[in-house]
Curated annotation (Swiss-Prot):
Species of provenance: Xanthobacter autotrophicus (strain ATCC BAA-1158 / Py2)
Stated name of the protein: DNA repair protein RecO
InterPro entries the UniProt entry points to: ARFGAP/RecO, DNA_rep/recomb_RecO_N, NA-bd_OB-fold, RecO, RecO_C
Top-level taxonomy: Bacteria, Pseudomonadati, Pseudomonadota, Alphaproteobacteria, Hyphomicrobiales
Gene encoding the protein: recO
UniProt keyword annotations, A-Z: DNA damage, DNA recombination, DNA repair
Biological process according to GO: DNA recombination; double-strand break repair
Length: 242
């Protein structure tokens, strides 16, 4: 068995004498593990840093085996992630959440989303918005997508300003006004892609964090990661007026 694909390094752990098990989010084969011989060496360390995109050739005798990876660099992002603390914390959080994807289940759209986010993550003005969009995309990939295009109460597509914490559906201003204190704000940029103010990004992270916690993490006995909290703190500092 053999194939070649693009992959984003999610994590690495030592295996035996000098080898490493590498976890990739591949473009066509989803989250996939493989052994890299000599992967624990200093020579291989720069290539195997989480966040890098690699060209991966996987070989195994049978498809169900873990198999071996031969990796070549495609996009090296180590310097960017080290230079921007919010980006490093953000990708750590993303990798931890991506680990919840079923192994070898294709998610090409999510692969493209993660790659695009990593390429723009250093930009402090867009980092918070990008993380919220990632969490929204991940919820959809896991079967818990939010419905933000029409009002749950009226079916209208206009004046969508709230989200119900129970249904995960948008609610228009008129229908939601009596219950506003029990609803989440719906930031416009999650619907129309416009550039948001910082307050809208905070609202978006509050929204996606709630559904990530209640629909994905808590049923698995997990909570929101420390890396996510560290990202939000670092991002807030990065955009604060000097």
């Amino acid at each position: 068995m053999e194939w070649t694909d693009e992959g984003i390094v999610l994590g690495v752990r030592r295996h035996g004498e000098g080898n490493a098990i590498v976890e990739l989010l591949t473009r066509l084969r989803g989250r996939h593990l493989g052994m890299v011989r000599g992967g624990a060496s200093r020579r291989q360390a720069p290539l195997l840093q989480p966040g890098n995109t690699v060209s991966a050739t996987w070989r195994a005798r049978l498809d169900e085996h873990m198999g071996n990876y031969a990796l070549e660099p495609a996009v090296v992002r180590t310097e960017v992630l080290m230079r921007a603390p919010h980006a490093a914390f953000g990708f750590t959080h993303m990798a931890q959440i991506l680990h919840l994807l079923p192994e070898r289940d294709p998610h090409e759209g999510l692969f493209l989303t993660v790659g695009a986010i990593l390429d723009a993550f250093e930009n402090r003005e867009s980092a918070g918005r990008l993380l919220a969009r990632f969490e929204l995309a991940l919820l959809a990939e896991l079967g818990f997508g939010l419905e933000l295009e029409t009002c749950a109460a009226t079916g209208r597509r206009e004046d969508l300003v709230y989200v119900s914490p129970k249904s995960g559906r948008a609610v228009c201003g008129e229908a939601g006004a009596p219950y506003a204190d029990r609803l989440f704000a719906l930031p416009r940029f999650l619907v129309d892609g416009t550039a948001p103010p910082a307050g809208d990004v905070e609202d978006a992270l509050r929204l996606t964090g709630y559904f990530l916690l209640t629909r994905v993490l808590e049923p698995r006995g997990l909570g929101l990661s420390d890396a996510r909290a560290a990202f939000i703190s670092a991002w807030r500092r990065s955009i604060a007026p000097a």
